Amino acid sequence: MSSNATDLTTGYLSSAAAILLFGSNFVPLKKYDTGDGMFLQWVLCAAIWLVALVVNLILHCPKFWPFAMLGGCIWATGNIAVVPIIKTIGLGLGILIWGSFNTLTGWASSRFGWFGMDAEEVSKPMLNYVGAGLSVVSALTFLFIKSEIPNNPGSSDTTPLMTEPVINRTEDRSADSSWVDRLSTTYHRIVGCSLAVISGILYGSTFVPIIYIKDHSRRNDSMYAGASQYDLDYVFAHSSGIFLTSTVYFVAYCVAMKNRPKLYPEAVLPGLLSGVLWAIATCCWFIANHSLSAVISFPIITAGPGLIAALWGILIFKEIQGLRNYLLMMLAFCIILAGALCTAFSKV
């Protein structure tokens, strides 16, 4: 098998693994109350950093580039909204929307060389444009799908580790609920979709610093001259940025809550598992980026998890119901599949 064929095989297999894991990594959290998500964010990011540390040791500790941490900071900022998104519009629809905008941002920045990156060329540019255009259509389609989310998805026996002393349980129950739980049904969809769009754009920018370093490593006059071309060498710096940023946000949250944050013990192990799944998926994505290039891997890996998450939402959690929604979902699936295939074949 030729080197090019090996790269393509490795890239597409890594993409498939990343799609499956990204589409399922929030599933362990669905049955547990996670409050406003700030504590969960920190637990999840701690697990991500630990997995990245293991990978870094396996790779014999490649050079640490601090600028690569910026991508992790961007990702952690977008990830703050995950719990509110899932609580307002559901797991399936949330991942579908943020995945679509993730796709467009990542594809456009790689294809056109935004933020100082080198523009990436493909052998069939028209097919690549069609694939990206179909991602836009799928994103618009998802906005018309209505999800059904219960007001209190957490179990009734879930209680925070740290809350105000309870004198009147009836009055304090509403006080203990997060701002998301207190939103009226009217605002659920507006808030959820808006946050999903913002998160998607931030997610789509997360690899920009790494690609920037790789592109400038080929220039002798650059401070990044000689930097590694292997994407996985940057996973530890990327994850360190994630953990550092989430820690800063969590400390700020504790200060804002006057040192009485809402910590949910039942969410700790599911949060760690979710972080491990996400970290493994990200490592697969880094491998796919190296084997296929970001302009190919981004549209495939960012569009695919929505299909997996939607299946979880339809078959297991019953978030999406009704013939109209099922038909729209099937249409969106077909559009995503067509877009992913166009993108994949644009490099062949």
Curated annotation (Swiss-Prot):
It is a multi-pass membrane protein. Keywords: Membrane, Transmembrane, Transmembrane helix. SUPFAM superfamilies: Multidrug resistance efflux transporter EmrE. GO terms for cellular component: membrane. It comes from the Eukaryota. The chain crosses the membrane at residues 8-28, 39-59, 64-86, 93-115, 125-145, 193-213, 235-255, 267-287, 296-316, 326-346. GO terms for molecular function: carbohydrate transmembrane transporter activity. It is found in: Membrane. PANTHER family: TRANSMEMBRANE PROTEIN 144 (PTHR16119:SF17). Belongs to the TMEM144 family. This is Transmembrane protein 144.
